[in-house]
Amino acid sequence: TYGEISNALESFDNKRAAGVSSNKNSEYLIRLKDNIQSVQKVSEIPIKVVNDSEIIQLQDIASISRKPLSPVEDIFMYNGKVVVSVAALGAMSPRVHDYVDRARLVVDDMRSSLPEEISIEEIYDESFYTSKKFDELIKSFSLAIFFVLSISLFFLGIRPAIIVTLILPFSVCLVMIGCRAIGLPLHQTSITGIIIALGLLIDNGIIVVEDYKHRRNIGLSIKDSINESVRHLIIPLTAATATTVFAFLPIVTGEGPSIEFVGGLAMTVIMSITSSLVLAILLVPVLMSYMEKIPYFKNIDIYSEGYHNKKILDQYRSFLTWSFAVPRRALLISISLPVLGFLLFTTLPKDFFPAQDRDMFRINIELPSNASAEKTLERARIIRNQVLESGLVEVEKDYWFVGRRMPRVLMNIVGGKEKQGSNNVAQSVFFAKDYYQMIDNLPELSKLIVDKNPDILVIVDSFIAGPPVFSDVSYVIFGDDPFVLKQLGEKLELIINDAPDISLTKSETSNINTNIELDLKNSNISLSGINPKNLVNELYAANNGVIVGTMLDSNKEIPIRLKGINKPDDILGSASYLTIPSQNGFEYIDSFGESRITNKSSIITRQDGQRMNSVEGWVWTGTLSSATEDYIKDDVEKFKNELPPGYSIKQLGEAETRGESQASLYSSAVIYMILIVIGLVLALNSFRQAGIILSVAILSIGLSFLGLFIGQQNYGFIGTIAAVGLIGLSINDSIIVLSHIKEEAEKKLISKAELVEVVIRSTRHIITTSLTTLGGFAPLIFASVFFRPLAWAMSIGVLGATMTALLYIPAMFIYLKKIKY
């Protein structure tokens, strides 16, 4: 029997201690010399002694050879060739460039010692994409400095322009110090936060510069101008900054995969705007005073700096007078864009996160569950050739992982270094030569590949940013009866499949495994005198094989596997005619019962002890799952109401991940909203004025929706972040205008004409901050698909925020009856 052979082999493997011989002076370890060091030694192992003199060796009854593990469990294919893959992961602490450089030195050293027929190629390098992201940061930073300097020079003059521009590098340096202090690495999301903050950093500086210029113009000394500016602005600027900080804090303190993904972004934004406040209050007034002492600037009238045009000023004064004569006019003009944004929100496509801006796309395939790794590899080759022959995407290189998950080339890829997967599954990454060609033609390519492979599950898609999402549309049905769960799953699968843009669907319980089932009769086994346990062990050894020892080969320990020889073309026959020794010689296993091929569900999943059936759907590349969810919403609700007693349904997929992330964000946002209200009331010393500022926050959300609509962008998590950023910007401008109006109103009861002059005084720095912010965000529209929703929302929204500050705030102040009519 296989059991007897196994015992014989194990008994001759003497790689173990044989005891210790000791006396009062010393101890000696007793060990046997290793007797299995080659295939020949394994072949000569005695198995049985016959007639007290004849020895049956293993080579007499078995074929012994040294070969790779069969069947193969996982295969790696690179550019159509089966090769060996090595993945190296660095720790979080070292810089990726330094780590990659050190790894390359090791590889180069090894490459020089390899024979000619063996080569080493680098197929993926994370530092390349990190460098691109830093290049974007440097480019955005350079453009931001250019726009800030140019716009500030035009509107404010040379001295304010130099000072305001200096805030950018100083603030970024403070952020770098902060990241180092809290241990936040510079990666995609944290760098994104710095890029977002570039449009917000100089607002406080411009406001302080303009206020200082105003104080000097009315005759105050340098010292008094500094004191008055700081005294007047420290509370409103701190309140505005605190409002922005509280708006971003839910992203830092929330829970869930999305919050975890963008938490670094919120941290760098908070550090950026906080540093800009500190620099604006402490550094800007001092630099302005020093600038006045420089001989080159002494003859320049500080208030005359910047662009002046009396004709435009008179027309603007007339417009403000007309608007505030009937405050409803100013209100209607200022709220028209936000209201339009809210009305257009229902037309915005909804996604979770935008696509990755990398020249990579993926193809995942799943064959029937009984498919071997070799069969999956064969199908992977066919699909690879279909991609190359289509000519739709020019491929630079590609790699496939068959029978296991791919390594974590992106943070949202599940599997990583763990060897998880099945023989019937393959995952691949294709690197395109042209990113834009890839994005344009990927939808057509996905339909082509799916149409050519209707018998298997194929997913062709680009990589998305954000946390991992396993399927676009997903539901889980809970219940007790597997048969009922299967029927319900098939019914729900039809509902999902009927929706537009669905490329394929999958019900977990419909995943059928083909098995060889042996129906053994207990009576036959008992009459034969065979131990049932030995029978099962014989079956296992004959098919899967058992490890019976190891062979030392130099410094390697190779396992010895005992396995039966099966005919690959007759699996059922090999199982039926397996021989089992008995009292009367031997018996075929078919003598103890019947063998037949069966098809049964291969998966039984439970959650909290309850059976469940997962039903998933995938949409075509280039389409959004939100449209599919909206289409099937009523049918799914009807399906839910018709479920049998004891059965329930839960939505998963992208919708669940998106919902969990937004729920976590909004739940923690309530706490910070209360803190924002408290801070505004304390800063403004008025509930009504705090209410006006809060209404500005609501209007700014509508402006962000309008920006997304104009830019033809989807509303997702990045759009939500854009709305939060725009809230901070709008409140900042509005609080400053309101503080200027309050400053004049506290001296006396002002008239509408005087109100117009206060607004004109605030206009220069409001327009300057808006244009510099626009200049900071506009380049991002062309920089990356990841930033586009943010860039469009902020770029268009900031223009509406200007009208809100200059028209809405004064009009509401008039309604508070704080002026003379």
Regions found by a protein language model. Give the residues of each.
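Helix-loop junctions and hydrophobic alpha-helical segments within the transmembrane domains
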Residues: I123, T130, F134, V209, ...
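Transmembrane helices with small-residue packing motifs
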Residues: I251-E260, I335-A371, I413, V460, ...
